[in-house]
Amino acid sequence: MPTLPENWQHDWSHLSFTDLALELYSLFISSDEIPREDLKELIERSYSTFRHPEVAPLHRVGEKQWILELFHGPTFAFKDVALQFLGNLFEYFLKRRNANKVGAERESLTVVGATSGDTGRCALGF
């Protein structure tokens, strides 16, 4: 299990959503698996379609109360935060697997899911 750097609260408090995502995802995704620059590009692409520049802005509504807005993604659902990145991960690994393949050798990916409500619309982004 990864551990946070000693001064993470101070060092990461000023980061943008995408920069914070890069730091957090890097704890779980080895640079041997996805080089840091590739991971940064995946994160930036995943959240570039969000309607708010902060992706998921945090608003203070009371002395100790905050609201995190998770509806600024392409389908207005909180699930966009995870599924936009997941779709780009699928594409990244598929492109890597197909790098030197042609024609019938090339692999494809089919995602089959059953859902209701807002999840289905989010998953269509794949």
Where are these regions (language model features)?
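PLP-dependent amino-acid enzyme catalytic core
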Residues: 1-126
